[in-house]
Amino acid sequence: MSNITDPQMWDFDDLNFTGMPPADEDYSPCMLETETLNKYVVIIAYALVFLLSLLGNSLVMLVILYSRVGRSVTDVYLLNLALADLLFALTLPIWAASKVNGWIFGTFLCKVVSLLKEVNFYSGILLLACISVDRYLAIVHATRTLTQKRHLVKFVCLGCWGLSMNLSLPFFLFRQAYHPNNSSPVCYEVLGNDTAKWRMVLRILPHTFGFIVPLFVMLFCYGFTLRTLFKAHMGQKHRAMRVIFAVVLIFLLCWLPYNLVLLADTLMRTQVIQESCERRNNIGRALDATEILGFLHSCLNPIIYAFIGQNFRHGFLKILAMHGLVSKEFLARHRVTSYTSSSVNVSSNL
């Protein structure tokens, strides 16, 4: 029987967030020169992302849930997106704790937390693509009735969550906690003799559905949306274009580096490019850094999609006015200013 699943072969300190151990029988552990430094830098970064995401996405959900009257289709997407980003962020403290003492939470939590992290990662990215489709339909095909879109949006969101659950099932099925000799306990996949094949599948899934497909959908939809805005004589088209550019640019800046490094790591693990301890350590550090950059996207979503929008600002001020934190006169002045500065409501929910 092959010994590729023998935990003592693996360099457990070299596992990145994806938790995929090497499968080669001649695999030899490498010394990580910056393990302690990297560990605490990652913990601090996780904590900051958690706090910022918790604050921003909670505010977005609060504002949308308060404004039951006149809730738009985009608001439904934003609500689901904020929920996905919030649930994703809630797993970060557990992963941060595992950086200190290893995985001390047992197999059940290993499976559940891994599933939560993956489901909300996929659903967040897929919902971003759905928002771009919604903006494309609203601006490029403005004849589509609001009633039709409101009826469909619930099923689209359910579809995103369902697809995300299916894409995440391998992590739930195969992950377990293990405490190897002379090393900290870890949460990783046990894939048996098919480790190499399944590793490629588990790498292809986030590459495809977590980056490439959503990116092409956004580029297509926002590309045609920009073309329509250029042709139209709309007072708010320049503002809308700035938001669209911000959406695509932030997505690329956050997730492109991680996907490129993950691709390099996959090529190295499958022996397409030569593997060495120095290269493995460099890629491991790059994965840590670029992964944090990707996680930061969950904090930036509220800023891009909600805080920039005039509807969100007005809804937030309305909640403050209801609790006596701002005057109703100030709220009325803000409403008049928003109305006179946005004769076309095309960008308010972008």
From Swiss-Prot:
In the UniProt record, does the keyword Disulfide bond occur?
Answer: yes
User: Which organism's genome codes for this protein?
Assistant: Homo sapiens
Q: What is this protein called?
A: C-X-C chemokine receptor type 1
> Which segments cross the bilayer?
40-66, 76-96, 112-133, 155-174, 200-220, 243-264, 286-308
Outline which residue ranges sit on the Cytoplasmic face.
Answer: 67-75, 134-154, 221-242, 309-350
The biological processes this protein is annotated with in GO are:
calcium-mediated signaling; cell surface receptor signaling pathway; dendritic cell chemotaxis; G protein-coupled receptor signaling pathway; immune response; neutrophil chemotaxis; positive regulation of cytosolic calcium ion concentration; receptor internalization
Q: Is Glycoprotein there in the keyword field? A: yes
| GO MF annotation list | C-C chemokine binding; C-C chemokine receptor activity; chemokine receptor activity; G protein-coupled receptor activity; interleukin-8 binding; interleukin-8 receptor activity
Query: Gene behind this chain?
Result: CXCR1
Where is carbohydrate linked to this protein? 3, 16
Its localization reads: Cell membrane
Output the Pfam families linked to this UniProt entry: 7tm_1 (PF00001)
